[in-house]
């Protein structure tokens, strides 16, 4: 066996054992850092929505979403095992988009379209809200960053093992496949 293959096999074994979250932390994506970055991104989203007059802070839809959010927050705090206290925040954006998402640290964004187009009940809003909160609590963004770091590392090891003849087209194709 050649040494590059053995090195690749060892690296793959270590990566597999270490897990995505640990790799994300080794790459500098610890919970605290992610929460700070997410808060900055959330604040930018809120500022832009406010400037564009798409930030909803008073409609009946906003009031329903906010009421559900406020009811669920204490339960989310109780089950938070990330080691970081979340500063839960909600932004409701006026848009026909049928979507909601959460950023690390508990930054929840809801689009009015998900409630209005789907005629969601408060229980259904709670289901969507709870789903988003679980993403934050389970630190799925950190896992995704770790998975991407592992993909990049494996790609680099593979390209190194394949030698210099792979070329940019092969590297670009591999990178597209990783996404």
Q: Which positions does each model-derived feature cover?
A:
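Hydrophobic helical h-region of N-terminal Sec-dependent signal peptides
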Residues: 11-15
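A Zn2+-metalloprotease active-site environment signal
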Residues: 2-8, 18-179
């Amino acid at each position: 066996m050649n040494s590059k293959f053995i090195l690749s096999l060892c690296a793959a074994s270590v990566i597999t054992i270490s897990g995505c979250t640990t790799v994300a932390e080794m790459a500098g994506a610890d919970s605290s850092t992610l929460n700070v970055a997410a808060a900055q991104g959330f604040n930018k989203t809120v500022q832009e929505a406010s400037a564009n007059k798409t930030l909803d802070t008073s409609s009946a839809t906003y009031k329903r979403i906010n009421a559900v959010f406020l009811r669920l927050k204490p339960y989310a705090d109780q089950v938070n095992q990330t080691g970081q206290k979340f500063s839960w925040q909600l932004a409701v954006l006026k848009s026909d988009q049928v979507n909601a998402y959460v950023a690390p640290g508990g930054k929840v964004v809801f689009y009015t379209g998900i409630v209005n187009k789907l005629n969601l009940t408060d229980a259904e809003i709670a289901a969507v809200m709870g789903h988003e909160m679980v993403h934050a609590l389970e630190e799925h963004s950190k896992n995704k960053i770790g998975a991407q770091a592992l993909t990049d590392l494996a790609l680099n090891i593979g390209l190194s093992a394949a030698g210099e003849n792979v070329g940019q087209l092969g590297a670009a194709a591999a990178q597209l496949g990783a996404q």
